[in-house]
């Protein structure tokens, strides 16, 4: 089974490397020539625990390669994963331009060939409900036949930055969205080595799969905003939020994960995905009230932290030197996207502070 990964960002690089580690022949495609050359040397473009070792080993053993040539991937692979950026647009909706362009480029290549064979196109990116349908329509518009020339699958990632390699190698579950039994069987085959410990491969329709990813991230973000609200109230009433957190976290119905109060969530996923799910609800005329609260609380946490620091020095930080430990949005990663620390630092600088930051 030959696998191609279109996009070598965080998700694409981890996905491709881990499939290669399990013995598959993997070709990763990216338009950035410098990035491709760096990866071909075995030098990762992101920091992720255990990734560099696997990258070097699989390149050396000939299972993993990198290229800028999409045609090489299109005609040399059975399964093609689209692991492309879906950044938020001005209205909060996910920008699907990269995904749609890749789908169109692949369709053009296959449509121009007399015998391109059958391919499974997999949306690995976090995408709104209906994206699989959109990709399918793009390919059908090139006169490709669904079920004969191609099938489209939704296969969201559930990787935690910092432990993404471990998450991919031993997933708690694999979600596969497709109405094609042929495509579903291929997906079972490539994921079977990862679930030998008995964790499930859940096959469902594409829209349910796409919703699963957004619902999961939005629920985790909700837990963070909830415990931050509890922490704020604890300060008012004289309670210890750490004790409260432990008290509720030992309830098996709740669990203790994501119940750590702080200055709010950040990163490339939670803020974007909560906004995108809210935007989806708006498009369908549904008022998803709790998501507004989650985002509002999260914004308030970082504002509140900066305000407290400034007010504790009488409203001015002129001449003050402040150390900031931690710039990434979470531990064990170098990802600073949407990091709450950056907002706090900017506010402290505006108040006249000198910042000494460490990570």
Please describe what each predicted stretch is.
Residues 1-359:
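Structural/interface elements that position substrates and couple domains in central-metabolism enzymes
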């Amino acid at each position: 089974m030959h696998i191609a990964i279109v996009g070598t960002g965080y998700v694409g690089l981890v996905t491709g490397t881990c499939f290669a580690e399990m013995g598959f022949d993997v070709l990763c495609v990216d338009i950035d020539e410098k990035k491709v050359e760096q990866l071909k040397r075995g030098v990762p473009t992101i920091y992720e625990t255990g990734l560099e070792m696997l990258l070097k080993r699989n390149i050396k053993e000939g299972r993993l390669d990198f290229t800028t040539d999409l045609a090489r991937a299109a005609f040399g692979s059975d399964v093609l994963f689209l692991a492309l950026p879906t950044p938020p647009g001005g209205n909060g909706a996910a920008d699907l331009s990269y995904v749609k362009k890749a789908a169109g480029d692949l369709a053009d290549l296959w449509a121009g060939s007399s015998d391109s064979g059958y391919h499974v196109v997999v949306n690995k990116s976090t995408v709104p409900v209906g994206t699989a349908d959109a990709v399918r329509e793009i390919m059908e518009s090139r006169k490709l036949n669904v079920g004969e020339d191609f099938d489209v699958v939704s296969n969201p990632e559930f990787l935690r930055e910092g432990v993404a390699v471990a998450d991919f190698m031993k997933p708690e579950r694999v979600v596969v969205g497709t109405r094609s039994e042929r495509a579903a069987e291929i997906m079972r085959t490539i994921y079977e080595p990862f679930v030998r410990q008995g964790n499930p491969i859940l096959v469902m329709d594409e829209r349910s799969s796409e919703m699963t990813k957004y619902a999961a991230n939005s629920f985790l973000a909700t837990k963070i905003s909830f415990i931050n609200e509890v922490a704020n109230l604890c300060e008012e009433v004289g309670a210890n939020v750490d004790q409260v957190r432990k008290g509720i976290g030992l309830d098996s119905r709740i669990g203790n994960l994501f119940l750590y109060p702080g200055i709010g969530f950040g990163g490339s996923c939670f803020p974007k995905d909560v906004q995108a799910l809210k935007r989806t609800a708006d498009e369908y005329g549904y008022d998803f009230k709790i998501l507004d609260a989650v985002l509002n609380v999260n914004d308030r946490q970082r504002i509140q932290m900066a305000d407290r620091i400034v007010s504790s020095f009488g409203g001015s930080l002129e001449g003050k030197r402040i150390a900031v430990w931690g710039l990434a949005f979470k531990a064990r990663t170098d990802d600073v996207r949407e990091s709450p620390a950056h907002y706090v630092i900017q506010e402290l600088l505006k108040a006249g502070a000198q910042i000494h930051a460490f990570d």
